[in-house]
Each structure stands twice: as structure tokens, then as C-alpha cells.
Amino acid sequence: MTTAHQDITQLGALDLSRAIHTMQVSCREVMLATLAQVDRLNPQSNAIVSRVDSDVLLAQADERDAQLARGESMGWLHGVPQAIKDLANVQGLRTSLGSPLMKDFVATEDGLMASRMKAAGAIAVSYTHLTLPTICSV
């Protein structure tokens, strides 16, 4: 089902959305490729600081595939994995805002950005690293 000779993780957002919606690639395949990429690169880059459990992510991807099979799409981000900066609440993820003081805070609900991305079909995979000086400079 994957696009021949093309690494899924190298597709841009629009091309990935198009491939998912035309069923050239499944949401599960996209998620598996994304998780493999994170597992391969994160030990060196330390970009991902909090991640949703793989089984939960694959179940969400399977649900997105089932929706497409029924002719339903949530929007152009349908099934597209998203890493969100550790600045916006994502329900169930540890949200530190880059501060050691917040290291144990777990969001009980999605913030505006995450809820809009999810409403458009995105699957929130993880938080990306954020340092406190980043927030202070905004």
C-alpha cells in the first residue's frame, strides 16, 4: 500500500495528506514509519520529551483508516502524526513548559491548538523539547 521508492517520513504535509486520502498509504503505515523514525533519531537529538504510548497511537491510526474506509475524513490532517511543542496542553501528556517546576504536570484536557489539530484529523504523537528561555523570549 505504500508509495513505491519513497520514504513516508520524507513527504511534506500536503503530499502525505493526499497519499492518505487516496489510500496510497495507510494511517497505520504512516504511524509505524513515524515511530520508527522517532526511535531511530531521538536518542541523539533529544527532540521528543514526552510521547503517547505506541499501542494507543496505532489504535488511533487504525480508527482513522476505518473512517476513510467508510468514506469519512476529519479534514486535511486526517491521520497525519504531529509532534507538538511542549507549550500547548495535550490531554494525557506530561506538559512541562520547559520548566523543571512543571515536570510532573499532566494535562487533563487539550489546549486550543491541540484540539483544533485533532479536530482536523491529526494524531498527537508527542511533545518536542522546549527550554524555559524560549518561553521567556516570546
Predicted regions and their residues:
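Residues within well-ordered alpha-helices
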Residues: D15-L16, G71, L112-M113
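Immediate post-signal peptide segment of exported/extracytoplasmic ligand-binding proteins
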Residues: R64-V80
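Secretory-pathway/luminal and periplasmic proteins that interact with or process carbohydrate-rich
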Residues: D39-S45, G71, N89-T95
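Single conserved hydrophobic/aromatic residue that forms the stacking wall/gate
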Residues: H129-V138
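An N-terminal boundary/leader segment
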Residues: M1-Q60
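Glycine-rich loop at the start of a catalytic domain that most often binds anionic cofactors/ligands
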Residues: D62-R64, N89
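Short glycine/serine-rich loop/turn segments
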Residues: W76-L130
